[in-house]
Amino acid sequence: MIKNERDLWKLLKKSSAGILFDRIENWAVPGVPDLLGYNQNKTFFTLELKLTKANKIKFSPHQVSWHLRHGPGAFILAARSMNRDKNTTVAKMQHVGGLRAGGPTHFFLYESRQILDLVARGLKVDPIVGGLRIDEIIKFLNGLGANAPRP
């Protein structure tokens, strides 16, 4: 069960065969994403971790600015917690994801370029990958740079 971003980090670390993750100390440079990843294709990427109980995702102004300035290779992983109570309001969505209170955790991966939509519309924005399991997100991140020429 995921209760906070630390639990999301632990799940990601445990599930991410083939990807090396380094956790970044964010107090040094505000807005820098939580993780630096390096996959089996020798591709670096960043990952901002977010946990929410409803559709709204909270970002600091520094995080928004960072994602606006960085393009490909910067991602946001949002998890909607199963710890929603009966009073939590969630909007109906067309993409992958359960919406009932008390339902399972769902994972959503977004590109950096989607940051302004995420601030405005939260999880109503279609993810590039999403679902009940984190495996598909790991598969996507592991595939980054697969078509790039190797040295």
Predicted regions and their residues:
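Nucleic-acid nuclease catalytic cores
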Residues: 69-114
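Mg2+/Mn2+-dependent nuclease catalytic core
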Residues: 52-71
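Beta-rich catalytic cores
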Residues: 31
